[in-house]
């Protein structure tokens, strides 16, 4: 029995240009204006970006400076090989720099389970705050987080690869 999500996705007409980077930029701009602490974007796309005005480096820089986490689902099985590779690389980069995750299901039917997994991830996120050392230069900085439990040993931690220090909003740093 098909779910409401499957029916909705089945009704989507997949044609024409794809401007996924522009869509992400617009969504990030919108989310940054919000008052909620947790800002998450779920991107579901069917193809390679071939219509965006923003360049990938600029989008990744924007995401690095934002507090928006991106989860990406690429329905790319119908794409030609090169387009699929390009779309996969983009979605992986966007998810990684923002501390999210990317998924590439073979069928539309798998999307509901992935959306449920993303919802679980979002509900189980923590925000880490720390004082930025004095003398820290403006710009991007690498950060690595490891966690260990006495009962379970090493834990899997997914974070952004770093943070962007800006003096006006630098203390405390998040993530």
Regions found by a protein language model. Give the residues of each.
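Scaffold/interface architecture of coatomer-like assemblies
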Residues: 1-175
């Amino acid at each position: 029995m098909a779910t409401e999500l499957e029916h909705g996705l089945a009704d989507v007409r997949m044609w024409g240009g794809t401007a996924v980077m522009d869509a992400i930029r617009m969504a990030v701009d919108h989310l940054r204006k919000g008052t909620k602490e947790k800002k998450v974007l779920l991107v579901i796309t069917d193809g390679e970006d071939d219509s965006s005005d923003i360049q990938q480096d600029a989008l990744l820089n924007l995401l690095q400076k934002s507090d928006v986490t991106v989860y990406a689902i690429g329905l790319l099985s119908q794409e030609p090989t090169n387009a699929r590779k390009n779309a996969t690389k983009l979605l992986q980069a966007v998810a990684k720099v923002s501390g999210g995750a990317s998924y590439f299901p073979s069928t539309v039917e798998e999307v509901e389970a992935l959306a449920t997994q993303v919802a679980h991830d979002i509900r189980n996120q923590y925000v880490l705050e720390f004082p930025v050392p004095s003398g820290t230069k403006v710009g991007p900085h690498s950060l690595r987080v490891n966690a260990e439990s006495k009962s379970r040993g090493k834990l899997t931690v997914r974070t952004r690869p770093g943070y962007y220090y800006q003096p006006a909003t630098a203390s405390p740093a998040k993530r």
